[in-house]
Amino acid sequence: MEEKKKQTEPEACKVAKKCGGCQYQGVPYKEQLKKKQKMVNALLSKYGKVEPIIGMENPYYYRNKVHAVFDRDRKGNIVSGTYEAKTHRVVPVENCLIEDKKSQEIIRTIRGLLKSFKIKTYDEDTGYGLFRHVLIRRGFKSGEIMVVLVLGSPILPSSNNFVKALRKEHPEITTVVLNINDRKTSMILGEREKVLYGKGFIRDELCGCTFRISPKSFYQVNPVQTEILYQKAIEFAHLTGKESVIDAYCGIGTIGLIASGHAKEVVGVEFNKDAVKDAILNAKENQIRNVRFFQGDAGEFMEAMAAEGNSMDVLFMDPPRAGSDEKFMASAVKMGPEKIVYISCNPETLARDLKYLTKKGYQVKKIQPVEMFAFTEHVETVCLLSKKCLA
């Protein structure tokens, strides 16, 4: 059985050392999970029992969001891939072991089309050239595919023919968006967009809800494990249908909308205005009427709610890797929800934030690591905190 398993696993990635994206390439998967468990235990076990990490059945080709940067090699050939770790040198990538296979096929096709259409790649040093990046998002359950072409100018020569040629090779593509990034910046996407084909977004299904995903929207990259993560978060909240819930850092409304069927009301807050637009549309599309979404800084929003004397029963918080800030957590403590469900992609900042919350009257009840990023050193963790009972 072990011999058969070894035969079906892909060969180790040939560019892993240069790319730097997968710190655990070459490490057996069970060993990766042990390393992550050990890391979470070391940081969080002082707050309570850390449950065994929930691993993946198949840790390959799981990323439904794929980004490629385009350049030319020394011979003038068009290459696509990723930036070498801590540099802006492009590492050509033919087959990434964690990125969606279909998306990688589309990127290879685009590389050929650039040559056929004589489109020049962008040169970061000189600022000349046109074609910078490609971003592809694929709906795991819907099968819908969005291709975002990132250019240094608003005009793609022969854009209609380019899109036709691309869709001839890949008729499964449901929308193509032109994103204009004409600044000297390390940011991938610019502010302006133009839809070349389709609706300009895709839809996907998660935990029974349908979600609209735009080029700039945050949506978890591992769809199978995301369902497990969110189901665990809802389970930890132990909602009865009577609770008022806040979904902080709500993105396109995923957690809030999934929780809405188990709660009295949900309020979501998110800084990214594009994500908030999607969240509002997602609520309408799912015919959910007990959810409201607001655009703004989560800390300031919570502060204002606390100042007005508003209270909530449950707080879901899913901050970025930097964790939450003290302003947000101080206002959260002031509002005093009975339960806080904290979803974290960085156990170090989670440990820091738990230290603050446990000093302010909360007790960690459950800690569950979830594998979301196989072959990398990253790990997601969901924690349940409850108000301490005063004797």
Model-found features: residue ranges?
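Extended interfacial segments that mediate partner engagement and assembly in macromolecular machines
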Residues: 7, 23-121, 136, 141, ...
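Short cysteine clusters
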Residues: 13, 19-22
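Solvent-exposed residues in well-ordered beta-strands and their adjoining turns
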Residues: 2, 69-73, 137, 150-152, ...
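Short, aliphatic-rich beta-strand segments
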Residues: 71, 136, 143-152, 210-214
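Nucleotide donor/acceptor-binding cores
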Residues: 64, 143-145, 242-243
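Flexible, glycine-/basic-rich loop-and-beta segments that form/coincide
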Residues: 9, 13, 89, 388-391
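Short, acidic/hydrophobic/Gly-rich beta-strand patch recurrent on exposed beta strands
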Residues: 81-84, 148-150, 279
